[in-house]
Regions:
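Intrinsically disordered, low-complexity repeat and linker tracts
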Residues: 141-178
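Short acidic/polar inter-strand loop motif in beta-rich domains
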Residues: 114-122
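N-terminal small/polar-rich segments of proteins
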Residues: 44, 51-58, 134, 140-141, ...
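Short, surface-exposed loop motifs enriched in S/T, G, D/E and P with embedded aromatic residues
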Residues: 66-90, 103, 125-129
């Protein structure tokens, strides 16, 4: 079955299993196979951010497959024809997507209320992928700085995606009601 964006695919393996004893104990450690992308948005000079209204990206083309022996999802080399809404928590936006390998920048659209205005400002930017990829099992945390009419990305952290609660859900960010 082809895989889709927006799904946290988990995979586990245990090569040290002993099923011959009467008390079978098999520790299972799940790992994330998709990729997580996070944008931490902050104000630069000359602007006061009031609210992140919406964030959307163009994720990897869906339809990838997972190797059930290794848990690896084959990365797409192209973007989807559809955008995806990101989860928002304060000034943090997050999305789970299939792995992607391309040197083409990823489209990102942010709608932000700033400086006490009632109409959101729209920022359309292209985000370069670190080393041309978003690898499965990793979390990419971008710092996004809004400076009036532009967005810059001064830093991106590539982390092993292990930050989960007891149910396996990502710890950050979660959707908050308005």
């Amino acid at each position: 079955e082809p895989l889709n964006n927006g799904v946290d695919y988990l995979w586990a393996s245990n090569k040290l299993q002993d099923v011959t004893s009467t008390q079978v104990s098999m520790p299972i450690l799940f790992q994330h196979c998709a990729t997580q992308i996070v944008f931490n948005i902050s104000a630069g000079s000359g602007i006061k951010l009031d609210k992140l209204v919406s964030a959307s990206i163009t994720p990897a083309n869906p339809g990838a497959t997972m190797d059930m022996i290794t848990g690896e999802i084959t990365p797409s080399t192209t973007y989807s024809t559809e955008t995806a809404n990101m989860g928002i928590n304060g000034f943090t936006a997050q999305y789970i997507m299939l792995p992607l390998k391309t040197n083409t920048a990823m489209p990102l659209t942010l709608q932000i209320l700033a400086d006490g205005e009632n109409t959101p400002r729209t920022y359309n930017v292209n985000v370069l992928l670190p080393n041309g990829e978003l690898a499965g099992g990793d979390s990419y945390v971008f710092s996004a700085v809004i400076d009036g009419n532009s967005v810059s990305f001064p830093n991106v952290e590539v982390l092993g995606w292990t930050e989960v609660d007891e149910t396996g859900k990502p710890l950050y960010p979660s959707q908050k009601p308005d």
